[in-house]
Amino acid sequence: MENISVVRLLLKLSPPVMLALLIQSIYNIVDSFFVSRYSAAGLTALSIIFPIQLLMTALATGTGAGINILVSRMDGTGETKSQADIVKGGLFSGFFNYIIFACAGLLFIRGYFSISSDQLPVQEQGIQYAQIIFTGSLGLFIESNCTKILQAKGNMLTPMIAQVTGAVMNIILDPILIFGMFGMPESGVAGAALATIAGQFAAMIITLTAVFRIYRFQGKIRLHNCISIYRAGIPSIVMQSLYTLYIVGLNLILKQFTEDAVTVLGIYYKLQTFFFIPLMGLQQVILPIISFNYGAGKSKRVKDTLRYFRELTVGGQVFSSPYFARSFCWFLWHGFFIMRG
């Protein structure tokens, strides 16, 4: 984190993160495709629940970012003794997030779908999908925190393996559980939800095992550490949550015209992820680099990291936008009709 040049560090650490994000983006599209083959109402239901899943991800990744910042900063200052306490507090925070989100989600999901759709099949399938996702979201919250802990230590490979494993498992299980293949019962959208949960738990097991090898979970859960984690992660949580509210607002507006528009919007945001993979990959990489060097008092490397990040992302987006826009619009238009049959 301190001896390699900033540019080399960014280019070395970013590819595994970007590959994991690419696989996850592909899985999102494949997931929607299989559901659309089963039921058009199911595809609309997934588009409606998508912003709530983003909210769940915002809480998970935001909390993980808080852990990442604290662990990297401690590495920079040489304060390693209390890292185990931060890690233990981070894992507890993941479990706490799960309890809060699962309870709130199960309590309010029926009301959310009642205002988001007037079609009974969409409501029923959406509620069924959401209940499974919320109940089994422990894997997402723990995996996200473990991933950020490993990234804080400069380990980008294990999180990539975990996320790719989870996504591939999800893609394989989707048709089996949705359509009832190989002797499995036909589960429809519930099968898609179960496949998602299975993939998340597979990723959690891989990252949790890697974290255990480093810390052996010897720390103690301390309230002030948990508060520090949320304080460091709250900007990320709030910004991503506002994006979720924006999509929910658009869905409510589009619903007044036709629910097909809501479906198209959901497909659009899943496709849009491909365009932002380089940005999101670099964003995840610079967090531990900046935190480490800030803790070590190396302000020049902090400024250099921000400068190179800005140059790489702006340059990349400007260069790729003209080529991406045309193919993106074509795929969105044709992809909607392919998915709807």
Where do the model's predicted regions map?
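Short membrane-interface helical motifs at transmembrane helix boundaries
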Residues: 100-131, 321-341
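Residue-level signature of transmembrane alpha-helical cores of multipass secondary-active transporters
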Residues: 13-21, 54, 94, 133, ...
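Small-residue-rich hydrophobic transmembrane alpha-helices
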Residues: 43-106, 140-159, 265-330
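Helix-terminus/linker motif at the lipid-water interface of multi-pass membrane proteins
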Residues: 22, 26-44, 113-120, 176-187, ...
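Signature of the first transmembrane helix
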Residues: 8-68, 72, 234-256
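Alpha-helical transmembrane segments of multi-pass membrane proteins
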Residues: 120-145, 273, 279, 339-341
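Membrane-interface helix-loop junctions in multi-pass transport and translocation proteins
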Residues: 157, 168-204, 326-334, 340
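Interhelical loop/hinge segments that connect adjacent transmembrane helices in multipass membrane
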Residues: 1-12, 189, 193-196, 205-244
